[in-house]
Amino acid sequence: MDKLIIGGVEIKNRLFVGSGKYPSNEIIKDVLEGSGSQVITLALRRVDLDNKEEDILQNIPKDVILLPNTSGATNAEEAIRIARIARAMGCGNWIKIEVISDSKYLLPDNEETIKATKVLADEGFIVLPYMCPDLYAGRRLIEAGAAAVMPLGAPIGSNRGLKTKELIQIMIDELDIPIIVDAGIGKPSQAMEAMEMGAAACLVNTAIASSEDPINMARAFKMAVEGGRLAYEAKMGRESKFGNASSPLTGFLD
């Protein structure tokens, strides 16, 4: 069984979760327990060290890895600045690069993301860039020092599933780096599909947070990710366009 190692840390639970859109900060601790997630993303604006009641960190156990994102950045320079602030605030050296200047579809800017990744990786950050799935951009992100890459399945927050499935599959097949499917996954079955494809992990936020029961939805996603990974490692049987009986069709009545 392959291990998932990012930044020298073994990640045993391949479901990453986000921290936005929940009805309250207090529920996040229960979602983390239900999902078993070791990694949680958070926007820096939700960290308030001067007001513990509003500070999201008060609801995240100390053994969970913080993955601050650069939400709000529209270019590489802004993303770099946000990342440095996050580390200075004590959020660690993991960073999810988000560079988005498109306000309609919220698609990440791969070129600016590559620039930010290079600078931050050189500064010792563990960089996980959010990106539009593209093989060439993935290769350049690896060259820039990315620890993993996070291609979107569909526009962020859309719950539409794996609309970019074929492009993600190419990246999984061709890149020697963890591929974490991020954005657009709306159902546990879609997370399972991503894992069956060979994705290293999935990051899910909106599908859990917007459900009627986020805690049980987190549990459902945990099982789906585990099942999908197990199926991938078990090497699924080949598809056939013809029927293939599982029992002999001749000889019984002879």
Curated annotation (Swiss-Prot):
Disulfide bonds: none annotated. 1-deoxy-D-xylulose 5-phosphate binds at residues 157, 183-184, 205-206. Its main location: cytoplasm. SUPFAM superfamilies: ThiG-like. GO terms for biological process: thiamine diphosphate biosynthetic process. One of its GO terms (molecular function) is thiazole synthase activity. The keyword Glycoprotein does not apply. Its EC number is 2.8.1.10. The keyword Isomerase does not apply. The active site is at residue 96. One of its GO terms (cellular component) is cytoplasm. Homotetramer. Forms heterodimers with either ThiH or ThiS. Belongs to the ThiG family. This is Thiazole synthase. The lineage of its organism: Bacteria, Bacillati, Bacillota, Clostridia, Eubacteriales. The gene is thiG.
